[in-house]
Amino acid sequence: MAREPRKNAALDAQSAEDQTGLLTVKVEKEEASALTAEVRAPCSPARGPERSRQRFRGFRYPEAAGPREALSRLRELCGQWLQPEMHSKEQILELLVLEQFLTILPGNLQSWVREQHPESGEEVVVLLEYLERQLDEPAPQVPVGDQGQELLCCKMALLTQTQGSQSSQCQPMKALFKHESLGSQPLHDRVLQVPGLAQGGCCREDAMVASRLTPGSQGLLKMEDVALTLTPGWTQLDSSQVNLYRDEKQENHSSLVSLGGEIQTKSRDLPPVKKLPEKEHGKICHLREDIAQIPTHAEAGEQEGRLQRKQKNAIGSRRHYCHECGKSFAQSSGLTKHRRIHTGEKPYECEDCGKTFIGSSALVIHQRVHTGEKPYECEECGKVFSHSSNLIKHQRTHTGEKPYECDDCGKTFSQSCSLLEHHKIHTGEKPYQCNMCGKAFRRNSHLLRHQRIHGDKNVQNPEHGESWESQGRTESQWENTEAPVSYKCNECERSFTRNRSLIEHQKIHTGEKPYQCDTCGKGFTRTSYLVQHQRSHVGKKTLSQ
């Protein structure tokens, strides 16, 4: 009779122990599932274009009241996805190709690529090539030091992307994740073959790590467990120190998993984790692209050495100083050319007109006036120019760009000189003054036009202080400075001071419109009217895009 109570007590103890074991297994499974959800959570929300595509593809006929409403709803969802009012035909075609490209990828690989949110097929190719390079590299032997722990943690995080699915759809994925040294073994087998994990004296912790790599956990590995197992002297710590150290590691666990193991710093050096808003999750998911561009220690050292050499050369070579203004130059030729500003020396002389220049490049540009060379051609209208700056100014007539803005009234201009002239309206400045009557003007051209009233042939040029006659003007230019000459229209007897103005005026009577718009065919009497009209086409084209 005494044996039966003992037997019952033993059975009760064994039952309690079994229940405790089942509870432990259940807790570990819950931890694994929670960890899986934590890894997937930051990148799970679909972004704008992807969300619109999913709504379009996921629409079903029963959701609409009838066939007409279903068709209308499909058109609306397709428009929200492809956005034809914003995207060109090429961009819409690229979106369709991207969708099909992602569809033909194997299951696990497709999920990983979609989490990176590629915006074009080229980005998908770059991601796949990067993944192949990372997984085809031979795994280095892990040293015992801190650097080996760090490298192993990062490699383990890359391997967590492989899941233990046995479907036929995942066979190409398994071939892609082939590793040279560890082969295509399961993740927990690979971990147990890493030097440092299979050594004696760590059996308890090895069993703990291996227990978390069951098929139920889908190949996920807790980063802090690997870091703790590899820490030197881990087995010498007592249980209280182990728990304290594990709690400290647990604080940094979420940040390590969410970053996919791409952070290449020790987990114990990480700052406390701050909860990020949802809009920041997308940025975290794209860290892999940025990490791929981070140079290795050797490359970083080489780049730093090159930078230091450049800085030394720049500092050491800037020893040519101008004694007049203190400006320094890297080469003596630059200092020699600069000194001519102070001395007024102009050694380069034009053989055609005798004009002199400080530099040879200025002489080359000037000689194009005599040769008629105009090497810079506008691709839009074919007009040619002798200087690149003139071409840039001209191209703004096609694009409608006006980069120069007045701070006082907000009016914009395509050229800086036009802005300077406009500023004189606000300041009231009139720097050009007539020597005959004292009248002042904002522009030099207005002064010259005014001086024709006085009929003075030796009118002083305000820019050079020389008379027009002393500058060797031609007879045709003298006709513009002589005066006043009256050019009279035979049709309406209106008179003009310039013959060119009379010719432009006569087009009103003849109806001639020689300047035609290539876009719409409309004709104009003046080029300025045509240029102003062409800007309307540019504005419409910009709005349509």
UniProtKB/Swiss-Prot annotation:
Swiss-Prot/TrEMBL keywords: DNA-binding, Isopeptide bond, Metal-binding, Nucleus, Repeat, Transcription, Transcription regulation, Ubl conjugation, Zinc, Zinc-finger
Cellular component GO terms held in the UniProt record: nucleoplasm
Keyword Magnesium: no
SUPFAM superfamilies: beta-beta-alpha zinc fingers, KRAB domain (Kruppel-associated box), Retrovirus capsid dimerization domain-like
Biased composition (Polar residues): 468-480
Tissue distribution of the protein: Expressed in adult heart, brain, placenta, lung and kidney, but not in adult liver and skeletal muscle. In 17-day old embryo, detected in liver, skeletal muscle, brain, heart and small intestine.
Glycyl lysine isopeptide (Lys-Gly) (interchain with G-Cter in SUMO2) cross-link, chain position(s): 26, 29, 178, 222
Entry's Gene Ontology BP terms: regulation of transcription by RNA polymerase II
Residues covered by the SCAN box domain: 53-135
KRAB domain segment(s): 221-317
Pfam families, sorted: KRAB (PF01352), SCAN (PF02023), zf-C2H2 (PF00096)
ZnF (C2H2-type) intervals: 320-342, 348-370, 376-398, 404-426, 432-454, 487-509, 515-537
Record's compositionally biased regions (Basic and acidic residues): 455-467
Entry GO MF terms: DNA-binding transcription factor activity, RNA polymerase II-specific; identical protein binding; RNA polymerase II cis-regulatory region sequence-specific DNA binding; zinc ion binding
Region (Disordered) residue spans: 1-22, 34-55, 455-480
Places the protein is found: Nucleus
The family this protein is said to belong to: Belongs to the krueppel C2H2-type zinc-finger protein family.
Free-text function comment from the UniProt entry: May be involved in the transcriptional activation of MDM2 and EP300 genes.
Name the record gives this protein: Zinc finger protein with KRAB and SCAN domains 4
Protein source organism: Homo sapiens
